[in-house]
Amino acid sequence: MSDWDSVTRIGAKHRAGAAPRETVVRGKSALNAAQRQGLVIATEKKYATGNAAGKTAAMEGQHLTKVDRSDDIVKPKTVGLQVADAIKKRRNEEGYKMTQKELATKCNTTITVIQDFERGTAAPDQKVLSAMERVLNIKLRGSDIGKEKFPKKK
């Protein structure tokens, strides 16, 4: 057969049906249908989507992917005892004396979040940490944790 006899067809209607294409299944019924046909099914968790994910959310997604793919146990990140002690100490100092409830109200969060931070078991939340820094006037992030953010001038 020479090159003159062969016909080249281009377009979606003339595609050869070689292998089934990868598709995203949306719903239980489509998943069950694929299982009945004996197709290969792979599940992947999508951690961050589009513009909803900021810089910190992307890092969190990377951490979750690392946890998902590793076989050994990965400890979740916590604020630590140094931050917890700094919050407790400052909350009980004269001039800043307040209850956990009052601190939670001023930081626009719940009492349980404040309790977790004071225990040192809370996951580092930048929004809550910045609010606490503002209310308590101490640094809770960086190198000098517990130091005054804006020291009084002499």
Swiss-Prot record:
Recorded superkingdom: Eukaryota
Record keywords, A-Z: Activator, DNA-binding, Transcription, Transcription regulation
Residue ranges of the annotated DNA-binding region, renumbered to this chain: 100-119
SMART domains linked to this entry: HTH_XRE
Ranges of residues in domain HTH cro/C1-type: 87-143
A molecular-function term among this protein's GO annotations: DNA binding
InterPro entries, per the entry: Cro/C1-type_HTH, Lambda_DNA-bd_dom_sf, MBF1_N
Region (Disordered): 1-23
Entry GO terms, CC: nucleus
Function: Transcriptional coactivator that stimulates GCN4-dependent transcriptional activity by bridging the DNA-binding region of GCN4 and TBP (SPT15), thereby recruiting TBP to GCN4-bound promoters. Involved in induction of the ribosome quality control (RQC) pathway; a pathway that degrades nascent peptide chains during problematic translation. Required to prevent stalled ribosomes from frameshifting.
PANTHER family, alphabetized: ENDOTHELIAL DIFFERENTIATION-RELATED FACTOR 1, ENDOTHELIAL DIFFERENTIATION-RELATED FACTOR 1 MULTIPROTEIN BRIDGING FACTOR 1
Family the entry assigns: Belongs to the MBF1 family.
Protein name: Multiprotein-bridging factor 1
